[in-house]
Amino acid sequence: MKRIYFLVLLVFSFCQSSAQTIAEQSVRIKSISERWELADSTRKGTFLLTSYKPFYFSLGRWSSNPNRQPHSENPAYSVPTPTDYNKYEARFHVSFKVKLLQKIFWGKGDLWAGYTQKAHWQIYNTGVSRPFRELNYEPELILNFPIRYKFLGFEGRTLGVAFNHQSNGRELPHSRSWNRVMFHTSMERKNWQITLRPWIRLKDEDDENPQIMNYIGRGEVTVVYGRPRHQIYLVATHPFNKLNRGSAQLNWIFQIRNHLKGHVQMSTGYGETLIDYNHAQNTVGLGICFVDW
């Protein structure tokens, strides 16, 4: 229950801090300059909590293939007995960032701290006392630089590097984690935005998920398309080898009334959560969105 109270408190605290921003807009795509404060006109200073990735709550999420007995290529991290998880659960996705330093490295760079958390809650599963099936914690340190370039009609806006840690905070045999150095660049054109994020995994002596790169992948692309009252975005990963795994997640955010926004999500592939890094499934979720791109 403590985890439930923490998540609820986190949701309402962030909603309150973002209330003014949300109240000023419906569903619209923010420019990259707005999101990363690249120009003097968009700078808000340091230590101000702002949105990072979308913030939503899926009231219902269906899986074609629930991961009832997670396994790893490292035998110490394979679960010996299955748990009777439902195909239906709820999902939280919370994400925010804060600028720690600005105009560093010749007055061009900004240093950000980012945090993303997702939680999969078996709220409809009374048979196993409605547990949280999986929680993933993802803190980041992000060094971001403004840049100008042209690519296929798109205008490049940012270039940077980040240190990313992701874990589920659990004990053996459910523990999963990895550390990455991630490179990123973002570009935009009218109603479109594209972000590319290739990464390098850092070595882990006690590897809980040895083949994670061959399942989740070695890079990610995010494509966002925005129109009045609607926003569609795709997040895809790929290992860039002959295994042809990875994942694809398609999202639709739409205005219902005033600032109430609906959220539909469909995904396929591996690694929806860390415990599922080598488990393939198709999912569909329906809920509400508090903060979009």
Model regions and ranges:
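Bacterial Sec-dependent N-terminal signal peptides
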Residues: 1-21
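Transmembrane beta-barrel domains of Gram-negative outer membranes and organellar outer membranes
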Residues: 21-167, 180
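Transmembrane beta-strand segments that form the barrel wall of outer-membrane beta-barrel proteins
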Residues: 77-81, 119, 159-169, 194-202, ...
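Solvent-exposed loop/turn segments connecting transmembrane beta-strands
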Residues: 85-88, 126-129, 169-177, 211-215, ...
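Membrane-embedded beta-strands of outer-membrane beta-barrel proteins
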Residues: 94, 139-141, 161, 181-185, ...
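Outer-membrane beta-barrel proteins
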Residues: 96-105, 144-152, 189-191, 227-229, ...
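Outer-envelope beta-barrel architecture signal
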Residues: 107-111, 153-159, 190-194, 217-219, ...
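Outer-membrane beta-barrel "beta-signal"
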Residues: 264, 281-293
